Amino acid sequence: MQDVKTYLSTAPVLATLWFGFLAGLLIEINRFFPDALVLPL
């Protein structure tokens, strides 16, 4: 179990989880507010 915790705390795994979370969050925001990501010019 300690090896699994050590593996999950490494930088590539944390970066993958973080970017996956951010991508999902942006997709959900874009789904509910489709024009929010477009800069108003």
From Swiss-Prot:
Q: Alphabetically list the UniProt keywords.
A: Chloroplast, Membrane, Photosynthesis, Photosystem I, Plastid, Thylakoid, Transmembrane, Transmembrane helix
Q: Does the keyword Nuclease apply?
A: no
Q: Which GO terms describe its cellular component?
A: chloroplast thylakoid membrane; photosystem I
Kindly list the residue ranges recorded as spanning the membrane. 7-27
Pfam families listed in its UniProt record: PSI_PsaJ (PF01701)
Q: Where in the cell is it found?
A: Plastid, Chloroplast thylakoid membrane
Where does the protein principally reside? plastid
| GO terms, biological process | photosynthesis
InterPro entries recorded: PSI_PsaJ, PSI_PsaJ_sf
In the bilayer, the protein is annotated as: Single-pass membrane protein
Q: Does the keyword Chloroplast apply?
A: yes
Regarding protein family, the annotation reads: Belongs to the PsaJ family.
The job of this chain, per UniProt, is described as: May help in the organization of the PsaE and PsaF subunits.
Protein name as it appears in the record? Photosystem I reaction center subunit IX
